[in-house]
Amino acid sequence: MPILKQLVSSSVHSKRRSRADLTAEMISAPLGDFRHTMHVGRAGDAFGDTSFLNSKAGEPDGESLDEQPSSSSSKRSLLSRKFRGSKRSQSVTRGEREQRDMLGSLRDSALFVKNAMSLPQLNEKEAAEKGTSKLPKSLSSSPVKKANDGEGGDEEAGTEEAVPRRNGAAGPHSPDPLLDEQAFGDLTDLPVVPKATYGLKHAESIMSFHIDLGPSMLGDVLSIMDKEEWDPEEGEGGYHGDEGAAGTITQAPPYAVAAPPLARQEGKAGPDLPSLPSHALEDEGWAAAAPSPGSARSMGSHTTRDSSSLSSCTSGILEERSPAFRGPDRARAAVSRQPDKEFSFMDEEEEDEIRV
């Protein structure tokens, strides 16, 4: 336990000794802050505004600030009376000369220092300068203030400049940050744009805006697409015409098919000529001059077949090119019926040739 007592006693003694060694040089001169406007030590050392020591229970003095005693001797006598009952007031006398010099140098600035009970501005000159100073830059650059200048904004500016000052000093203007941010960047600062005449609405907010990209190529593209949609139908119509032409070509072979029976007759008659006697040749020559009833029948059949093929061709073309198209199935059926008739005619001709 004695060790602890020694430690405690030594620490307390060192703290007291450090307080006793405090001098005026360790304290900075007044720098515009209330913490450095005055200083009072245990030994009676003091500088700055010590007028509050003359008052009782914080009551202000009857004398004005300029008429207050500012000499170092009066302050020393006042402090000596106040701290007469102090234990260390008579023991510490270090640095009195330095304190006197500092009090002399700070006497002019102490005249402008306000009462310590009423805080914060230091002198009246700075207060007057701040009173005539302009508003903060954020408020002067606000578009709301610019917009109000044209509409009787002078009154509002006067009210803004007539902010109630604390203790005769212009305190820093601190508006509500939310209101300031809402007011800043108002739409009244935007240039007035004439409304468009082609259907675009005027933008009512910064977040909603309309962009005109000029004439668009979409109309030209759509017109080309519509044109391409009509072209295949025209091509199909031309294709139908080709089918009609093809129909005439497919139905034309009856004319070409009509020739082979004659060639066959000549081909058959050619090899049979040497075997036939001369009277047979004479009979053939007479038959050529006066055709036999069989040949007449064959010729009649040829003429009837040719007329039927012509009528079928014309009917097929009319059916193909008629506006009321009856469908591809009936057209195919009509085309398929005609070759059957042709083949039947060819068979009949062969039978006639055999009979001859």
Curated annotation (Swiss-Prot):
<feature type="modified residue" description="Phosphoserine">
    <location>
        <position position="140"/>
    </location>
</feature>
<feature type="compositionally biased region" description="Acidic residues">
    <location>
        <begin position="345"/>
        <end position="356"/>
    </location>
</feature>
<comment type="function">
    <text>Probably involved in the organization of the actin cytoskeleton. May act downstream of CDC42 to induce actin filament assembly leading to cell shape changes. Induces pseudopodia formation, when overexpressed in fibroblasts.</text>
</comment>
<dbReference type="GO" id="GO:0030838">
    <property type="term" value="P:positive regulation of actin filament polymerization"/>
</dbReference>
<protein>
    <recommendedName>
        <fullName>Cdc42 effector protein 4</fullName>
    </recommendedName>
</protein>
<dbReference type="GO" id="GO:0003723">
    <property type="term" value="F:RNA binding"/>
</dbReference>
<feature type="compositionally biased region" description="Basic and acidic residues">
    <location>
        <begin position="123"/>
        <end position="132"/>
    </location>
</feature>
<feature type="region of interest" description="Disordered">
    <location>
        <begin position="51"/>
        <end position="102"/>
    </location>
</feature>
<keyword id="KW-0133">Cell shape</keyword>
<dbReference type="GO" id="GO:0007266">
    <property type="term" value="P:Rho protein signal transduction"/>
</dbReference>
<keyword id="KW-0472">Membrane</keyword>
<dbReference type="GO" id="GO:0005737">
    <property type="term" value="C:cytoplasm"/>
</dbReference>
<feature type="compositionally biased region" description="Low complexity">
    <location>
        <begin position="287"/>
        <end position="315"/>
    </location>
</feature>
<dbReference type="GO" id="GO:0005912">
    <property type="term" value="C:adherens junction"/>
</dbReference>
<dbReference type="Pfam" id="PF14957">
    <property type="entry name" value="BORG_CEP"/>
</dbReference>
<feature type="modified residue" description="Phosphoserine">
    <location>
        <position position="109"/>
    </location>
</feature>
<dbReference type="Pfam" id="PF00786">
    <property type="entry name" value="PBD"/>
</dbReference>
<keyword id="KW-0597">Phosphoprotein</keyword>
<feature type="region of interest" description="Disordered">
    <location>
        <begin position="257"/>
        <end position="356"/>
    </location>
</feature>
<dbReference type="GO" id="GO:0012505">
    <property type="term" value="C:endomembrane system"/>
</dbReference>
<feature type="modified residue" description="Phosphoserine">
    <location>
        <position position="118"/>
    </location>
</feature>
<keyword id="KW-0206">Cytoskeleton</keyword>
<feature type="modified residue" description="Phosphoserine">
    <location>
        <position position="292"/>
    </location>
</feature>
<comment type="subunit">
    <text>Interacts with CDC42 and RHOQ, in a GTP-dependent manner.</text>
</comment>
<feature type="compositionally biased region" description="Low complexity">
    <location>
        <begin position="133"/>
        <end position="143"/>
    </location>
</feature>
<feature type="modified residue" description="Phosphoserine">
    <location>
        <position position="18"/>
    </location>
</feature>
<dbReference type="GO" id="GO:0005886">
    <property type="term" value="C:plasma membrane"/>
</dbReference>
<feature type="compositionally biased region" description="Basic residues">
    <location>
        <begin position="78"/>
        <end position="87"/>
    </location>
</feature>
<feature type="modified residue" description="Phosphoserine">
    <location>
        <position position="142"/>
    </location>
</feature>
<feature type="modified residue" description="Phosphoserine">
    <location>
        <position position="138"/>
    </location>
</feature>
<feature type="modified residue" description="Phosphoserine">
    <location>
        <position position="64"/>
    </location>
</feature>
<dbReference type="GO" id="GO:0045335">
    <property type="term" value="C:phagocytic vesicle"/>
</dbReference>
<feature type="modified residue" description="Phosphoserine">
    <location>
        <position position="105"/>
    </location>
</feature>
<feature type="modified residue" description="Phosphoserine">
    <location>
        <position position="295"/>
    </location>
</feature>
<keyword id="KW-0488">Methylation</keyword>
<dbReference type="GO" id="GO:0015629">
    <property type="term" value="C:actin cytoskeleton"/>
</dbReference>
<feature type="modified residue" description="N6-methyllysine">
    <location>
        <position position="5"/>
    </location>
</feature>
<feature type="region of interest" description="Disordered">
    <location>
        <begin position="122"/>
        <end position="182"/>
    </location>
</feature>
<feature type="compositionally biased region" description="Basic and acidic residues">
    <location>
        <begin position="318"/>
        <end position="344"/>
    </location>
</feature>
<dbReference type="GO" id="GO:0008360">
    <property type="term" value="P:regulation of cell shape"/>
</dbReference>
<dbReference type="GO" id="GO:0005829">
    <property type="term" value="C:cytosol"/>
</dbReference>
<dbReference type="GO" id="GO:0005856">
    <property type="term" value="C:cytoskeleton"/>
</dbReference>
